[in-house]
Design a protein with these regions (language model features):
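Bacterial N-terminal signal peptides that target proteins for export
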Residues: 2-13
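Cysteine-dependent hydrolase recognition
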Residues: 27-373
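Bacterial N-terminal signal peptides
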Residues: 11-21
Length: 373
């Protein structure tokens, strides 16, 4: 007599088989030096110094100023050709969505979807980020920030050993922030100070601003409600971000577990991520060096699972060398424990602003006088 399988068992087995197929290569490495910059002709001249620096760092850089003007389908074709003929590791889109279009899905754009270049899974086959600007001057500001950061052109490197954990109290925020704080403090070889800012605190905006401008921080792990123009639970607006003055105190990496803060497609000015990236001036850039933000609504449980992976695991894995790979690894690790739908939303909606090839600063360099890494 054949024994009938329990329907629940079959359902669970099916879920794990689907997850295995879709996320089977989630531990793949992002080794390689091929970089493709996609932009328009109006930004080409401003990119010269930046490209020369990337080449000096050992990257094989190609500049494409034609594909963007022809639309997302042509961009996808270019990326596929590049990947198929010699590989591709870093994709940097330079310009706002009106300059360099994104893959448009149901109700939101998805730059990460450009990286699905091999197989039928949901594992990106290259790293991607966007330097979102509207003018050559805005681009020069952000590129000067990248150059200053990568070359280590700082008089003081204390900011490397400082971190911020900022969290709402709901959606498991108290427990999440506590675990991050405990984990980071358990690495005194990396951190002297871990600043925890909670939704229940007073003067939250000032605390965030002071941590960036006065203390100087390596990264901000943020978990809370968000909007297109602000962190909502721990209030910090695009106006607050645009007015930051932290040229001398390092540029933080921001991992934003929040809805809509990376909505670069809105029509009423900059989203919060863009404001953080555009802060300062050409002579004195400020704000963040990178910002991971949602293009639309996000799944808080999935986001904080990825954030734990980033700042409790991969940050301390020194084989993970770049900001892009750090966030990529964290997202994929979280996806392995999600259903297909939740994993796909997390992957397609989370956008990295900045340069995905920028190396991480983990330790204060032995020589602190304008080092070139």
């Amino acid at each position: 007599m054949k024994q009938k399988k329990c329907p629940f068992f079959l359902l669970v087995l099916g879920y794990f088989l689907i997850a295995f197929v879709i996320f089977a290569n989630a531990d793949q490495s992002m080794a390689g030096n091929k970089m493709l910059i996609i932009t328009t002709s109006k930004y080409a001249k401003v990119l010269n110094k930046y490209i020369n620096w990337k080449i000096k760092r050992g990257l094989d850089v190609e500049l494409d100023i034609l594909s963007a003007e022809k639309g997302a389908e042509i961009i996808q074709r270019k990326l596929q050709e590049k990947y198929d003929h010699g590989g591709l590791t870093y994709i940097v889109l330079v310009g706002d969505i009106d300059d360099v279009p994104s893959v448009m899905l149901a109700g939101y754009p998805s730059d990460p979807s450009y990286t699905l270049l091999e197989g039928n899974d949901l594992i990106g086959d290259a790293l991607i980020s966007r330097i979102s600007v509207n003018t050559p001057a805005e681009l020069e500001n952000q590129l000067n920030k990248v150059l200053k950061y990568e070359k280590g052109d700082f008089e003081n490197f204390d900011w490397i050993r400082h971190a911020v954990v900022a969290s709402m109290t709901g959606f498991d925020g108290v427990d999440h922030a506590g675990k991050l704080e405990t984990s980071l403090k358990s690495h005194p070889d990396y951190f002297d100070e871990v600043i925890k800012i909670m939704e229940s605190d007073s003067n939250i905006t000032k605390k965030i601003r002071d941590s960036i401008e006065k203390t100087g921080v390596n990264f901000i792990a943020h978990h809370g409600h968000g909007s297109t123009t602000a962190f909502a639970s721990l209030h910090f607006s695009r106006e607050n971000a645009a007015n930051l003055k932290n040229f001398d105190t390092g540029f933080p990496i921001i991992h934003g577990a929040a809805c809509s803060t990376g909505s670069f497609w809105i029509e009423d000015g900059d989203c919060l991520a863009e404001a953080f990236m555009k802060a300062g001036t050409v002579e004195k850039p400020a704000g963040a060096i990178a910002f991971l933000g949602g293009a639309t609504s996000m799944d808080p449980g999935a986001c904080i699972a990825a954030q734990k992976e980033v700042f409790m695991n991969y940050y301390f894995d020194e084989d993970v060398e770049t900001i892009g790979e750090l966030f990529y690894k964290g997202t994929l690790a979280a996806m392995k424990n999600l259903s297909e739908d939740r994993g796909e939303r997390l992957f397609r909606r989370w956008h990295l602003f900045g340069d995905c090839s920028t190396p991480l600063w983990r330790k204060i360099p032995a020589k602190t006088s304008k080092n070139e890494r």
